[in-house]
Amino acid sequence: MQAANPRRGYILGLSAYIIWGLFPLYFKAIANVPAVEIIIHRVLWSALFGALLLMVWKHPGWWRELRENPRRLAILALSGTLIAANWLTYVWSVNNGRMLEASLGYYINPLVNVLLGMLILGERLRRMQWIAVGLAAVGVAQQVWQVGSLPWVSLVLALTFGFYGLIRKQAPVKALPGLVVETWMLVPIAIAWLLFNPTAHSAQLEFWTTSEAWWLVAAGPVTLVPLVCFNAAARHLPYTTLGFLQYLAPTLVLLQAVLLFGEHLSSSTLVAFIFIWAGLAVYSVDAWISLRRRS
């Protein structure tokens, strides 16, 4: 990995996570469009802009490798379905006043990844990792006890993204070509949805004279730009550094939920966040100690 320019890496990494953290502002701008329809257009425009970007930003041999390995294509079809489910849940949560739950979901995602590694890949957890996962579990259990139901938005976001990452590891394709293939595999479903929903907002000609239409078209660049920034940052920074930066996005979502959109941060929700933050602190310290020992 090239790490010759850490300053550039930090700028690119921060840019990626800040854009991801500010996604709620974008989705609020098209809140009148149903979440499913937003995702349909996110798939279509990401596929189009991604294909154009691949023509400019060359990735030699990626399509030949996929064509010669149908198993990887099948894996990308499955991972594409998972990321679409993740996108749908996130957009729905933002536009239905559940941003705090969305933030919680992305906070617990690293700990869910650790748990999936143990349960599915047979990885052995270190003592501090057990403590981190346990603290997060207490936070979720506390929410169930106080609210009387599972924080399903948080769990769906964390699990779909966790399984997405797990499955994508089975198809070693670079991020941009992988995302382009994932979205193109969903394009037939997206087109079929539009054909069978003639009353949809974007199926009306007059809709395309509104500003919301341009916001929908922007779904392609909005999806791809932070991904490109992240991939570029990964060439200049250690992956563990990017791991620490990832907490910026859910923090921005949390701040927007409370300060901009008036979501109520109850004492019980705050307690859940505190347990999960404590778990993340333990997880981060453990990752730092492990890195020091390896080096």
What function would you assign to each model-found segment?
Residues 92, 109-129, 251-270:
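C-terminal transmembrane-helix exit sites in multi-pass transporters
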Residues 18-22, 26, 77-94, 156-167, ...:
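Hydrophobic alpha-helical transmembrane segments of multi-pass membrane transport proteins
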Residues 104-108, 173-185, 224-259:
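Helix-helix packing/entry segments at the starts of transmembrane helices
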Residues 43, 247-295:
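C-terminal-most transmembrane helix of multi-pass membrane proteins
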Residues 1-15, 48-76, 127, 179, ...:
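Membrane-interface interhelical linkers
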